[in-house]
């Protein structure tokens, strides 16, 4: 895994720098997201691990992606195929998103709750996290019934567990001590 991240970093940096220069960061993220999903396809994974010539592999990959990739995105695929690095596309996407977040001074914040939160609740969480992290935040909302009630908020290494499940687990720990 760390090998792929090391391999992915220069590709992500090159793609990000190009995207910023051409004011197409959103488009590039969409292309990389699609390409990363294609690599996760079972048939494509077999193709990637096969002994195809890089040109054939690149053209097959580009054909599967169709119009989701522009000419520059196709060039990235060709270069990565030539170097045998198409398997690293999910990590390239991850690194690209990280570079974008750093560039835009935003933080990804996961909000996990038992039920969907209202816009007002999300706005309060967003404002509180922006104040705490001193940067803009992008909320990724997930629903997990095992939370029972309340909310779990994660950003990087920070976890704020305000869930009933978390409180019950802490209570059980105290009672067992």
From Swiss-Prot:
InterPro entries: ATP_synth_OSCP/delta_N_sf, ATPase_OSCP/d_CS, ATPase_OSCP/dsu
Cellular compartments per GO CC: plasma membrane; proton-transporting ATP synthase complex
Subcellular location: Cell inner membrane
Principal place of residence: membrane
Keywords noted in UniProt: ATP synthesis, Cell inner membrane, Cell membrane, CF(1), Hydrogen ion transport, Ion transport, Membrane, Transport
Membrane topology: Peripheral membrane protein
Keyword Ion transport set for record: yes
Classification via PROSITE patterns: ATPASE_DELTA
GO molecular function terms attached to this record: proton-transporting ATP synthase activity, rotational mechanism
Subunit structure: F-type ATPases have 2 components, F(1) - the catalytic core - and F(0) - the membrane proton channel. F(1) has five subunits: alpha(3), beta(3), gamma(1), delta(1), epsilon(1). F(0) has three main subunits: a(1), b(2) and c(10-14). The alpha and beta chains form an alternating ring which encloses part of the gamma chain. F(1) is attached to F(0) by a central stalk formed by the gamma and epsilon chains, while a peripheral stalk is formed by the delta and b chains.
Function: F(1)F(0) ATP synthase produces ATP from ADP in the presence of a proton or sodium gradient. F-type ATPases consist of two structural domains, F(1) containing the extramembraneous catalytic core and F(0) containing the membrane proton channel, linked together by a central stalk and a peripheral stalk. During catalysis, ATP synthesis in the catalytic domain of F(1) is coupled via a rotary mechanism of the central stalk subunits to proton translocation. This protein is part of the stalk that links CF(0) to CF(1). It either transmits conformational changes from CF(0) to CF(1) or is implicated in proton conduction.
Family that this chain belongs to: Belongs to the ATPase delta chain family.
NCBIfam families to which the protein is assigned, alphabetical: ATP_synt_delta, PRK05758.2-2, PRK05758.2-5
HAMAP family: ATP_synth_delta_bact (MF_01416)
Descriptive protein name: ATP synthase subunit delta
Organism: Shigella flexneri
Lineage of the species this protein comes from: Bacteria, Pseudomonadati, Pseudomonadota, Gammaproteobacteria, Enterobacterales
